[in-house]
Amino acid sequence: MMKTIRKISYLLLVISILPILSSCNNEDDVVKIFTGKTWKMTFIAKEGSKEQYNFWGEQGMTSENAAYKNSMDALAKEGNFILNFEGGDLNGTAGGSFGGRASTTSVSGTWNANGESKRLDITVEGKPVDKDVYGKAFITGLQNAIRYGGDENNLYIYYKDGQTTKFLAFHPQ
């Protein structure tokens, strides 16, 4: 009888400790997500949509629209619309420096991201100006970043553009 009670007590103890041992951490490994790869932008969309946002006005996203065609040619070109993040963990947040290229200009600056809240702060150095419509939107997205989403295979940088929230979508190159 005592052995049975002891076994039940041990079993209850193990069961009560199990949730503590297996508790999960909902915080992202931000350094692993951002660093160690070149991120290539794939598109820009409005929050809640997976469709390319129309930055090209009334003519829209057609091959007849020279501005749209120029943007898509620039996007397809290797070395354009890329970001490289460097950094490490700094007391629960990650941060460091970044560099990259829009369409016709380079960008660089600093970044800081919180893995728990997903808050993202990006400071772009200088005042880069891109001649391409999509390049301008890329720079605006970095300058107005508010949070990030994704994982090691997809990165989304959300930003405010007036009253609208949009995001830059990236994939490792």
Go through each PLM region and give its residues:
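Bacterial N-terminal signal peptides that target proteins for export
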Residues: 1-11
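C-terminal motif of bacterial Sec signal peptides marking the signal peptidase cleavage site
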Residues: 19-23
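Lipid interaction determinants
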Residues: 10, 24-173
